[in-house]
């Protein structure tokens, strides 16, 4: 009897765990809100940067394409940023959670990837190709459930891809800020001023939670500055930002101005 009760207890724990997973994993139905992975690689010096570029360009991105993901973004800080030469941002979009969960297994079985990326994947412990990397996993907002690729005629080293992170003091404040973007109309204002958004999304796993992140794009730094001036002075923003329900929904804003690499799909 005791053994049966013990087994029943284990099963109860597993069932409870299983049904708690959808809080993170179930997400929206297939074909609706996408999921995004942002990898942030920390590097030191030109040597690591060159090895990172070689790996991403010739091994990782082609393998991800073979795995069924046609678009991968790679970005680096602008030249006047103190993080220039120290960080590489990787953006991978997934049509659903299953595609995210399957990618690792597909890469492990991809012999071409294993061969072409060997020097990076299995580098000597005392000569690593990067210091560390962190992963942020996000779910797209319902008012922009699918990412977009902007189209510019300017060279890549002139384009600005602005990644923003908005942290909130509490879960309730974070939810209200997401509401402000969606139902409140903040996304619509960005559309009106021509901010060329790539995505808006809620961080569901990662550091500095609760928070949301989004990326807008511009043909040049001049276009970037003009768009933000237009946003700040837009009558819809003045009305929206004055509403009491949205007060104090953001406690910290982090802004990262980036250029796409020459081999980025963006």
Give names to the regions the model predicted.
Residues 1-32:
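Bacterial Sec-dependent N-terminal signal peptides
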Residues 24-114, 118-237, 246-266:
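Short S/T/G/P-rich N-terminal loop/turn motif that feeds into the first structured element of a domain
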């Amino acid at each position: 009897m005791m053994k049966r009760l013990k087994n029943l207890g284990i099963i109860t724990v597993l069932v409870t765990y299983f049904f708690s997973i959808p809080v993170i994993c179930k997400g929206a139905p297939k074909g609706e809100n996408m999921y995004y992975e942002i990898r942030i690689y920390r590097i030191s010096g030109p040597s690591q940067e060159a090895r990172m570029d070689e790996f991403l360009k010739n091994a990782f991105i082609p393998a991800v394409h073979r795995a069924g993901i046609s678009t991968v973004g790679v970005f680096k800080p602008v030249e006047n940023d103190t993080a220039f030469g120290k960080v590489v941002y990787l953006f991978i979009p997934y049509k659903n959670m299953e595609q995210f969960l399957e990618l690792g297994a597909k890469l492990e079985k991809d012999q071409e990837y294993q061969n072409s990326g060997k020097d990076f994947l299995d580098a000597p412990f005392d000569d690593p190709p990067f210091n560390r990397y962190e992963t942020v996993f996000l779910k797209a907002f319902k008012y922009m459930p699918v990412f977009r690729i902007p189209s510019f005629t300017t060279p890549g080293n002139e384009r600005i891809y602005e990644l923003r992170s908005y942290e909130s003091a509490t879960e309730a404040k974070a939810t209200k800020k997401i509401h402000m973007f969606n139902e409140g109309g903040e996304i619509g204002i960005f559309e009106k001023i021509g901010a060329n958004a790539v995505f808006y999304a809620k961080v569901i796993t990662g550091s500095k939670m609760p928070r949301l992140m989004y990326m807008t794009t511009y043909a040049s730094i001049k276009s970037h500055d003009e768009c933000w001036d237009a946003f700040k002075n837009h009558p819809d923003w003045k009305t929206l930002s004055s509403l009491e329900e949205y007060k104090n929904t953001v406690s910290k804003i982090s802004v990262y101005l980036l250029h796409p690499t020459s081999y980025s799909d963006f």
